[in-house]
Amino acid sequence: MTIALGKSSKEEQTLFDIMDDWLRRDRFVFVGWSGLLLFPCAYFALGGWFTGTTFVTSWYTHGLASSYLEGCNFLTAAVSTPANSLAHSLLLLWGPEAQGDFTRWCQLGGLWAFVALHGAFGLIGFMLRQFELARSVQLRPYNAIAFSAPIAVFVSVFLIYPLGQSGWFFAPSFGVAAIFRFILFFQGFHNWTLNPFHMMGVAGVLGAALLCAIHGATVENTLFEDGDGANTFRAFNPTQAEETYSMVTANRFWSQIFGVAFSNKRWLHFFMLFVPVTGLWMSAIGVVGLALNLRAYDFVSQEIRAAEDPEFETFYTKNILLNEGIRAWMAAQDQPHENLIFPEEVLPRGNAL
């Protein structure tokens, strides 16, 4: 009798197949390959931020108190940037600055670099998570594309801007009041509000808020019928075949209001995606420009006339004077390592004074 030897119908799984099966299986919280980047980085970024705001001072880097331990509250606590003298050092715990000393590492601002880098990779991991899940259930990847906008803003503000300046010192510290200080710094030193990329960013964010409000109200106004369930989740069957609201009625309403209206849901929802994402991307591009110290609009003719004529002043020239005031008053406070001292007679005053 002849016995034919052949391969088993079930081939032996490789290590990659085993990992892929475990990572991508259906569970309450999806892990996925993106989770290998997302979960550790998000854990370390949040853990570093909570540790820094609770225990770590900014005395050695900014001359400030910045932790709950020192008396700050949620609005004033922060994980502060390293000192300007450390330039763009990665501030690794085992690096030449801290030499493995955790306390010294925290004093030097190592937690800021730790939180910033892990935060950036955590956000990228979250975007990849959306892309991976979309691929798994055969959706288009527009969620991931949309999330690229806040990633672009984070990377441009926290990483690219300080890379263009003299050090991480000029990045925002991770805290509420610290972000407010950074905004004032951006205005005083870069005239950020007059930057066209900032204008596009504001238009995108506020325009998106307006679109969301209009869209939500319109859908509520044109529901075919209210459900009789106790709440929204029980009122309607998620697998219903019919539409929930009348697009035709909504189109007629806004056609009468504005004279124009979206004719189909695809264009409507793409526009709601396009406005905020484009706005945030433009804002990120503008911050990259600031990293290179590119200037905003300059209306020099108005500045010259205001300097020659004490009675001539515009909102622009007043803002320029305010920016000078921010720089003069803020630099000495914000950069104590420079030992800046401005006599009162050189501090800016308006034409009226």
UniProtKB/Swiss-Prot annotation:
Residues that hold Fe cation according to the record: 215, 269
Pfam family, one: Photo_RC
Native organism: Cryptomeria japonica
PANTHER family assigned: PHOTOSYSTEM II D2 PROTEIN, PHOTOSYSTEM II PROTEIN D1
GO MF term set: chlorophyll binding; electron transporter, transferring electrons within the cyclic electron transport pathway of photosynthesis activity; iron ion binding; oxygen evolving activity
Binding residues for chlorophyll a ChlzD2: 118
Record's bilayer topology term: Multi-pass membrane protein
Name under which the protein is recorded: Photosystem II D2 protein
Lineage: Eukaryota, Viridiplantae, Streptophyta, Embryophyta, Tracheophyta
